[in-house]
Amino acid sequence: MKEKLKRHGLKLTPQRLELVKILTERGRHHPSFNEICRAIKSKHPNISHSTILNNLKEMTKLSLISSFNYKGETRYEVNPELHVNLVEPNGTIRDIKNEEILKHLREIVKLLNEKERSIKSLVILAE
């Protein structure tokens, strides 16, 4: 991720490097904005929430990370591949990589792109 940041002209400041480290270590666990803030502020207490948010937005815009909203909280992840985020009854979010499900998901994405133009993300709520 550091190389991608450099390629896009972003400086590798200590705070940004800490954010990259946190996302790399915790990104597959879909941390919330508040969880990321607590983690980065433990090492860089003077960093502002807006700096963290602006960096997360920039990384999302560059497709280095992705974000989604769950129960009013923005969650972040580093998995760029097509996948399903499964929310467990206890609130844990995990990636599903079942090939049969992914096959159907690719078909749905293809149909949506054909009928609804291009899509960036797809959220399905099934409770």
What are these regions (language model features)?
Residues R26-S32:
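Short capping segments at the starts of secondary-structure elements
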Residues S32-H44:
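DNA-recognition alpha helix
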Residues K61-E127:
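Non-DNA-binding regulatory cores of transcription-related proteins
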Residues E18-K21, E35, N54:
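Amphipathic alpha-helical interaction segments
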Residues I52-L62:
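Basic amphipathic alpha-helical segments that dock to polyanions
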Residues M1-E18, T24-E25:
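Intrinsically disordered, low-complexity serine/threonine- and proline-rich regulatory segments
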